[in-house]
Amino acid sequence: MLWSYPEGFAYFNEFAQSIIWEPVAFSYALLISGADLLLLAALALLSGYLRRAIPMFLILGLSFFSVILLGPLADLALPHRATEILTRPHLASTEMHPGISVMALYGGLLWPLTFIVALIFALLYFSYPMHKKGGTFSFLSFGVKSEESYERLKPAMKVLAAILVPLSALWTIYPGMLFFSQTWIYAWKNWGLMLPMFFGETFITATGTALILYYLERMEDERIRYPLLQIHGAAAIALAGVLILQMFIWGMWGNPNFAAVVPMMQAAAVIFLLTFILTLVSAKYEAITPIVPVLALFGVVVNKWNLIINGQLISRAGMGVLEPELAPNWLAEAVSPIALAILLLVILSYIFPMEVEEDAA
């Protein structure tokens, strides 16, 4: 039995259909990192730390975060009904639908609110830089043509950034919250450290994609590279610790069913430990820095696949491990949202400047 939005509970035969949440859910869970990028942009503005990376954080964050509501995070079991999260949100308890739907709360209320706040924040931030850039999209300066006018906008930007921090932070644990609530999946309901695991993964994905974009854009600024490496390495070692602790907890239970997910967890933990070591080395030897985020993102892919796909293969009936049965078009479905996010990234990076002068920020 599983929850399907908006109809309610549905029943299935796990032996006829071992995989209910297809790999496309894995892609959307990756794109949640857009919320972390928006969070980093807001914190950078408020603290003054990593300020030169704010344009990159905003462009990447909006590109990723814009995509996540288009599919399975609205209804991972029945993604074709995703639009109903906006048209039929269950934000209040009714006789037909008792309680409040977490999916409706996030998709019908929190996503539009977070997106609108982030978009206004980004437009205000880029207003004067767009005037200085000129060209076709200079109208996005919204009449802000002087440093004095831009300075008057900064209090409003700080208020929006302060609002954006808690809104974005709530998204970092949303996939973990959604998976953990699926008590009909044995592995997920017993994955006690799922929320901190997702929190660490989103930071690794966010900082990893930012580091990759840093090199693709040929930026040369230690004020961006070094702090990003620090956050990236801290998230990697923390996530390795979470995975090791979770395996230790399962080991104390002595339950053989978790053998289906432990090998890939071990591999992911080793990858994240190696990532941490490489971040320390690359702080001195910059040439190896591009390897670090690629390795870390590979670890995230391994870990998410293990959680989402292998986690479903542990029988809910206690009958051992099931065989995976994926839909024929699973790869195209999994790649499409990531491709759309990359397309948005290309468009936004063409419109908005990836680097902003200090006096214009």
Swiss-Prot record:
Encoding gene per record: ttrC
Keywords: Cell membrane, Membrane, Transmembrane, Transmembrane helix
Species whose genome carries this gene: Archaeoglobus fulgidus (strain ATCC 49558 / DSM 4304 / JCM 9628 / NBRC 100126 / VC-16)
Name of protein: Tetrathionate reductase subunit C
Described purpose of this protein according to its UniProt entry: Part of a membrane-bound tetrathionate reductase that catalyzes the reduction of tetrathionate to thiosulfate. TtrC probably anchors TtrA and TtrB to the external face of the cytoplasmic membrane. May transfer electrons from membrane quinol to TtrB.
Protein topology in the membrane: Multi-pass membrane protein
Family as reported in the entry's similarity comment: Belongs to the NrfD family.
Location of this chain's protein in the cell: Cell membrane
Superkingdom per UniProt: Archaea
Any single Gene Ontology cellular-component annotation: plasma membrane
Chief location: membrane
KW Transcription regulation (keyword) present: no
Annotated TM spans: 26-46, 53-73, 104-124, 160-180, 193-213, 233-253, 258-278, 288-308, 334-354
Subunit structure as annotated in this protein's UniProt entry: Probably composed of three subunits: TtrA, TtrB and TtrC.
